[in-house]
């Protein structure tokens, strides 16, 4: 079996700001106890330490470019990617997760990849901003996007000689 994946739309929690929700989500995935003191955290077009704030800046830019506020529906997306126990090192898993995020977002959305080693199976959490880097649009979660993530993950696993 190749890596199992899941695509999850992240929404704003009631009683919390979008910024606070983003901070909670990024803090969880970057937890030093789960990522060997942050050793297995990488990012694209943002700093992992300030990703929540940088995501918010892009959302504000969207408001300015489009002359309207974003609906408070999906604030970010999370991809979970789990590997069979003993199949991959945390460093390799982080590289595979980064490649999955880069290819899925086509480099148009900032993201953070955190590889967790606190369970028997190594797994990645990828959070990418729902707003494009240039502030022009939001990610469109198409009908088969979860299947597209799984197929792309399978392809990357095969390219990296991981088991089928």
Question: Which residues does each PLM region occupy?
Answer:
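N-terminal nicking endonuclease/strand-transfer module with a His-rich metal-binding environment
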Residues: 1-164
